[in-house]
Amino acid sequence: MEYFLRINGKLDNLNDYTSACRTNPYKGAQMKRKNEAKVITAILEQLKRLRIKKPVYMVYDWYEPNKRRDLDNISSFGRKVIQDALVETKVLTNDSWRDIVGFQDNFYIDTGNPRIEVTIKEVEKTNER
């Protein structure tokens, strides 16, 4: 089974988060909560009360307004926030190796409509890692 989640706009990146944490640990925590709240809102609207019990493979399509931000900075913090929000809303049981077997990042430019599209694919259990 496949599920789709769309998050409009963009999330803060790893450089923003690292800078906030260096300024003040509370500021970093506040930034993470703000980003998670945005993702949780999208999850509650689109995935409703979905509960996935099988392991998943996740595909992230990042649509940026331009090429200013480094790819790894966009995806690293963004994946963390999205996966934590999926666990917080109980869509996923956990974000461990057993629950998320892998992921893929794709990057695109869409100047008028930045967004993140996440495809969550259930997979059959593989050998324990």
Identify the function of each model-found stretch:
Residues 1-129:
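Catalytic phosphate/metal-binding cores of nucleic-acid and nucleotide-processing enzymes, i.e., regions
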